[in-house]
Amino acid sequence: MINVLFCFFSDEFIDAYINDLQIVKKSTNVSISADNAIIDLIFNYDLTNLRILTVSFNKDTDTLEDDKYIYVGWAEAFPFAILKETGEIVELDWEDPTYIISYMAKDQSSFLDILIEIEKLNQKDVFGSITEKEKKENLKQISIIASGDKYSWFLSNFDNEEI
């Protein structure tokens, strides 16, 4: 079915879309504990090309920390980080990193789970293989994975009213 859907898009679009989802394992492996899923991803995989909606990850050399945060990526022009105190993933104001714009996930694993589900939904949406009703249902399921309204930042990426 995907081949049929791809025929409606230019080769350039398809190549760019696929390129934005590439993750390549690095030749060296850094041992990271299982509860640090984002850190493991950043240090053990080349995420240079990975884009899911507006989300991208820092290179390992750009992953900085201070007493409050570990800065791990970007959502559009805003940095997102691991809040050390709680382990939550938060989106910060680029001008004032003490100001939390939104709470993105309760922990690192949940954040990655949310991104996977968002990308699956986005692909269905882009290729027109989902109805509005199914999209709403998918968004509800992602909200459940996200653990509720506190972590509903991703809803603004979809043309939805209320789920």
Task: Annotate each language-model stretch with its function.
Residues L92-V126:
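Compact, glycine/acidic-enriched structural inserts
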Residues M1-T86, I145-I163:
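A surface-exposed partner-binding patch
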Residues E76, E85-T86, L92-T98, K140-I144:
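Secondary-structure transition/turn motif
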Residues D113-I163:
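Mixed-charge (acidic/basic) macromolecular-recognition segments
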